[in-house]
């Protein structure tokens, strides 16, 4: 009986720990505003400050947003997911919510007041959404609407993707399709002839290593903001070429 009680207590403690962790990672609703850009097909949202390039081919689609400076956090927020709902405006709001991925920066415009055109100026939290995403919660003619937002887990198909660009002694790895928190905080790389080496964030979710790794199979460790790490061992074969994409593990 004592053993069973101890097991139940341990299970309950683990559940409470996970609940606290989830609450810390994905907080309560907060207030912001949202606008839209990129056109009806979202073609104007391609590229962006996170480095994801063609958002169709990298799997992000049209449910994306550019974040204001305070949310973007120098690129550390790239890949994070947010649930947004239009906030209590019967004329301009639509019911329901939409989940978007952070793929770009909405730059500040200090020539305009924060509440009249300088929507993305610090310290305002603001989402400049891809037009198709905005139209799921707001009316086109509104232009800008008040929203409530919260961080939510990212849901992805398949594993984390590593696209190797650059050249010898300058390996630039784009990390995409990250589930869970989505926002990569650190990356390490290991060649078949080297130990683990930390990479530095070059820009967005492009991570840089200056080691010579040509001809080696490659492994990656990816850490996200909730403290978890995924290791993808030998995910890149020795015969890799620059420009190729490889799929590893997932959160």
Curated annotation (Swiss-Prot):
GO CC term, one of those recorded: membrane
Record key words, sorted: Cell wall, Cell wall biogenesis/degradation, Disulfide bond, Membrane, Secreted, Signal
Expansin-like EG45 domain: residues covered: 47-159
Listed GO biological process terms: plant-type cell wall loosening
Superkingdom of the organism of origin: Eukaryota
Tissues expressed in: Expressed in lateral root primordia, adventitious root primordia, coleoptiles, shoot apex, leaf primordia, panicles and flowers.
Signal peptide interval: 1-24
Topology class, membrane: Peripheral membrane protein
Disulfide bonds: 50-78, 81-154, 86-93
Induction: By gibberellin (GA3), submergence and wounding.
Occurrences of domain Expansin-like CBD (ranges): 169-248
Compartments in which it is found: Secreted, Cell wall; Membrane
Matching PROSITE patterns: EXPANSIN_CBD (PS50843), EXPANSIN_EG45 (PS50842)
Protein family according to the UniProt entry: Belongs to the expansin family. Expansin A subfamily.
Protein task: May cause loosening and extension of plant cell walls by disrupting non-covalent bonding between cellulose microfibrils and matrix glucans. No enzymatic activity has been found. May be required for rapid internodal elongation in deepwater rice during submergence.
Protein name: Expansin-A2
Protein species of origin: Oryza sativa subsp. japonica (Rice)
